[in-house]
């Protein structure tokens, strides 16, 4: 029995370390298989012995339903923040701070020059965690009225990035943070939820106030911590010192934390965060600006509601409510008929929104969307916002939305395949054929210069072009009769079509429009199979062995090449002179092999395409965004937010000259 308890302690310590590496450091130190093996061993030992340590990772699964919430009195008050919605309001606050510091100095106080710390204002639910002298998570509570909150310890324990026991601790302390739901967790939850969540904030708040803790665990929340509200023993001298303390304790802290010493600095940070806010995987609604020096904070004090030493700059809302006027059904390249919401115009994040995404009929039903009702809309980084839900008190006199019974473009029969409706008329449905031809001619595909959707529509309507192979049968005398086509434009288009015959194999594969096969996947499968015939005859097992090709993509490829129409089109293209060439990339041994590299800014000796090709020839994985998993950022002139993010994350940044020197050392 004693040996089993010792093993339980050992496994708990090991598994908590693995969780810290994965969820806080974003640096997994063990495979999922090895983690699961140890986790299963721990569960078995706990069942056999009846011993479950209060910081065991098995407590995170939430196998309990509570009767209600108990009240908890915070040791340190959780204050609200005063809000500013313009830079002028920030300036007024800053000027008051300058005057105060000068007045205090005149009275003999030795205060440092003003220094502010800027952090993101997370849009979730505030939580207050209490760790005791032994480092155990004793209580977790909501903010409540700032003095008394609700005990949500069981719910907070489901957040995997929050340590249940600190590695080392001597003083009892309370730490404030924000429980949030990431976009990824939100989408995963909504994909199978009976009642989909309307937004990320409600997802987090609802999870922590759910008495069924298993439901909380399903939401897969995250958290960031940013303030120590109460601490026994040593007291901090600066906010930066406080943040270092939080980080050292193993609590998750956001990477963004900027020192500002002037209004110009603050403005730059506001501009930067507004620029990247829609690229984030979670919601923020502003920027918090706080004085760094704790003594200055103490002297400034508080109003009835707010600390005088901090202010929150609020961004324009990402969400709004408006009326759904109608639903429009549109046909895509694959024949899929998708719904688009037509809205009463509404201002959202500085943009007038008139349309929004509705994914399919299942999405419409789950969200309870009806014509004439008011809907929540959310704008992220997409051009078109998405409908998140419906205001239930506006459903009276609203109309049900019905799926299409025929193709809205050609009137043909429609079929339901999975969650989506499709037009079966692949031979003459205008939107399908026009979009197929436009995709085939696009830059990343066959790169037929000067080819537009307007041109494709004219070719379909006036010249009866119904297949991508028909492009290679065009004649000048046909083209010059089209609107805005003269001799020169006709010749240029014919030359571009002719020039496209000599193409790279991956471009040709991408141009064919295989479902779920983008440029990168096309390159990956071409490097594996090296020819059209090789790909046509590939087995499911061979396809899923290619990096980033999963079961769905593999099945899509197999089904695509089963179509007689596809095979006959490919054969006709080849007979018309299209000659896809496979250029085998020879990977040279390099320091960049298997490294993730991002290039940003203007490079002197490489275009975007050239640096990408060069890096791929060195065996690098080229990414378009910077994360903790990025190994190098090559920064050229006028490098912007990617460079800033790399510096924040501690990613190695090299210049173009340094990049070439690194290559030179290897040759």
From Swiss-Prot:
The keyword Transmembrane does not apply. One of its GO terms (cellular component) is cytosol. InterPro entries: BRCT_dom, BRCT_dom_sf, DisA/LigA_HHH, DNA_ligase, DNAligase_adenylation, DNAligase_N, Hlx-hairpin-Hlx_DNA-bd_motif, NA-bd_OB-fold. Belongs to the NAD-dependent DNA ligase family. LigA subfamily. It comes from the Bacteria. Its EC number is 6.5.1.2. It comes from Clostridium botulinum (strain Alaska E43 / Type E3). Zn(2+) binds at residues 407, 410, 423, 429. Signal peptide: none annotated. NAD(+) binds at residues 32-36, 80-81, 143, 178, 314. PROSITE patterns: BRCT. GO terms for molecular function: DNA binding; DNA ligase (NAD+) activity; metal ion binding. This is DNA ligase. Its cofactor is Mg(2+); Mn(2+). DNA ligase that catalyzes the formation of phosphodiester linkages between 5'-phosphoryl and 3'-hydroxyl groups in double-stranded DNA using NAD as a coenzyme and as the energy source for the reaction. It is essential for DNA replication and repair of damaged DNA. GO terms for biological process: DNA repair; DNA replication. It catalyses: NAD(+) + (deoxyribonucleotide)n-3'-hydroxyl + 5'-phospho-(deoxyribonucleotide)m = (deoxyribonucleotide)n+m + AMP + beta-nicotinamide D-nucleotide. The active site is at residue 121. NCBIfam families: dnlj (TIGR00575), PRK07956.1 (NF005932). Residues 587-667 form the BRCT domain. Keywords: DNA damage, DNA repair, DNA replication, Ligase, Magnesium, Manganese, Metal-binding, NAD, Zinc.
